[in-house]
A protein has these predicted regions:
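N-terminal ligand-binding/catalytic initiation module
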Residues: 1-132
């Protein structure tokens, strides 16, 4: 699976039991086949587990972050951003969508701190709080 080496070097599946179980189930069921999903949460090594589960489920995944242009800035680890891009996953900023260089054609957006609240997903938003 995507990112297995990086994840396994840092975490034991017992540390993320729900996402581990979901990835195992979703790899055969593929509930997200054909869905374009934007995940806009802080980008760090631990969020690779979330991406891995969504990819196992067939998601056409994009990872997004705001660099503050829309009033919100969410942190990210540039090393992990590069790793994601090296694995062929689209990384977009809110500014990319605002200026039209990336289409606002997502089916589902998982959004932390409202970074992409101006978008119009076909299926809807999942609001993930910044407070934890």
């Amino acid at each position: 699976m995507f990112f297995s080496e990086v994840i396994n070097d840092a975490y034991d599946p017992r540390e993320y039991p729900a996402l581990s179980l979901l990835a195992d189930c979703w790899i055969s069921r593929r509930p997200f086949d054909g869905l374009k999903i934007l995940v806009a949460t802080p980008i760090f090594r631990n969020t690779l587990v979330q991406y891995q589960a969504l990819l196992a489920g067939g998601a056409d995944l994009s990872v997004g972050y705001s660099n503050g242009s829309g009033g919100t800035s969410v942190p990210c680890d540039r090393k992990i951003v590069r790793l994601i891009q090296e694995n062929g996953i689209s990384v977009v900023t809110d500014e990319n969508v605002r200026n039209g260089s990336v289409a606002d054609d997502f089916d589902l957006i998982l959004d932390c701190a409202g970074q992409f609240s101006f978008c119009h997903p076909k299926k809807g938003f999942v609001e993930l709080t910044r407070s934890g």
